[in-house]
Swiss-Prot record:
Compartments where found: Cytoplasm
Coiled-coil parts of chain: none
Protein residues bound to NAD(+): 281-283, 331-333
Post-translational modification: The N-terminus is blocked.
Any one biological process term the GO annotation gives: GTP biosynthetic process
Positions of the CBS domain: 124-185, 187-243
UniProt family annotation: Belongs to the IMPDH/GMPR family.
Keywords: CBS domain, Cytoplasm, GMP biosynthesis, Metal-binding, NAD, Oxidoreductase, Potassium, Purine biosynthesis, Repeat
Subcellular location, principal: cytoplasm
Source species of the chain: Pneumocystis carinii
GO molecular function per UniProt: IMP dehydrogenase activity; metal ion binding; nucleotide binding
Annotated protein name in UniProt: Inosine-5'-monophosphate dehydrogenase
Amino acid sequence: MGEDSYLCLSEEIKKKLEEYSEKDGYDLDSLICSRRHGGLTYNDIIILPGYIDFEVNSVSLESHITKKIVLKTPFMSSPMDTVTESDMAINLALLGGIGVIHHNCTIEEQTEMVRKVKKFENGFITSPIVLSLNHRVRDVRRIKEELGFSGIPITDTGQLNGKLLGIVTSRDIQFHNNDESFLSEVMTKDLVTGSEGIRLEEANEILRSCKKGKLPIVDKEGNLTALLSRSDLMKNLHFPLASKLPDSKQLICAAAVGTRPDDRIRLKHLVEAGLDIVVLDSSQGNSIYQINMIKWIKKEFPNLEVIAGNVVTREQAANLISAGADALRVGMGSGSICITQEIMAVGRPQATAVYAVSEFASKFGVPTIADGGIENIGHITKALALGASAVMMGNLLAGTTESPGQYYYRDGQRLKSYRGMGSIDAMEHLSGKNKGDNAASSRYFGEADTIRVAQGVSGSVIDKGSLHVYVPYLRTGLQHSLQDIGVQNLTELRKQVKEKNIRFEFRTVASQLEGNVHGLDSYQKKLWS
């Protein structure tokens, strides 16, 4: 962009261009002007094309989602009970994004979901399941059935830091019919081990060469200190974009909590399970409750990243940034299943909100996450151009194989349920159990209300297939969008927007109709293959 885009021009043509007092279109500051255009949504704006001098596969989508954590794909799934549980969180993290596990469930259920994410891709497993010689084959089968893995080290104490004696894998017991046999009869004793302090890359190389399923890590005395899994090595090869911590190589895990006293207890359990990012889940984040919660978290868990929100104005953002937020969620009433703007008459059009909050937060190095109203790749591109570091999606990811719930058929279409956390259905979830665990009511400050006021609806969405096809489609589409704009990464996108080299246009209703399919008797809109 900028001067580089004039490299192919003759001096005469360049001079003629420079005779114009202004470039085509608007700069972003001029476009997002409430006095001129009112509040704008994503459909109200379009980005003008730039100059291409690079291949699309060279476009990097790396971006901060908090002050410390960087993703290779700036996609997040919303903490909704029909969008994100452990399956979504694991698979989105493998593809370079991150899923935020909802909290419309018991503390135990949410903690177990976090634990599943952290255990999925372990790097060095520092708290492996360990058995002793006194355990039996049935114990290994039970662990396999309950936790989904085998390859269990055997020590003299049956605990970590005991003397390593052997290992029992699924192959050792595959054709062994006596479940009462002691493990000493079936375990493998000829082991390949790594020494304590070995680098992960070196340990992975040993696994490659020895062709074993597990690599026990032992100290000088032969005591077990950690374990490395071959299955994790394969995951590293198959998912190079995976969102992982650089030291442990575990998948990054995020989960939502509220701001009630009980949520402090909930958060302690989540942190013990390995939580990396907490999302404070509220439709209106500018409250004394959230400010106090941020301060408490920063005191109790200084290494935990805090995403606060939701906010739509600079003034709201200022309070949460001052309290110590590491990132902000932006959006109020813009989601497809949200009726806050209609019912409460409070909120803000999403494009204007993302721009206003992102522009202010960037002065303090605080990333923003555009949450709500994302319907397609174009909306993702616009949100990032408006200043967001990532997008949070509910509707766009609901209906995938990895989202919670069962498929059902209606009129020949395969569907999944999708509901807003402000819907009556979500608010009544767990009503027969502990009402204190209902996140939907607390999110809208309504847990003490005798009459529930809905700020969302329940509905259904069409089957979108697996994330492993759908997310690469979104990712590749975003790369093509950035190529059309003429930037190779998101840092350059924000820089060129700030320097007013990337230009925008306001779209009238007629221009929006023109920019969509029109003039056909019928058509089929197939978006990917």
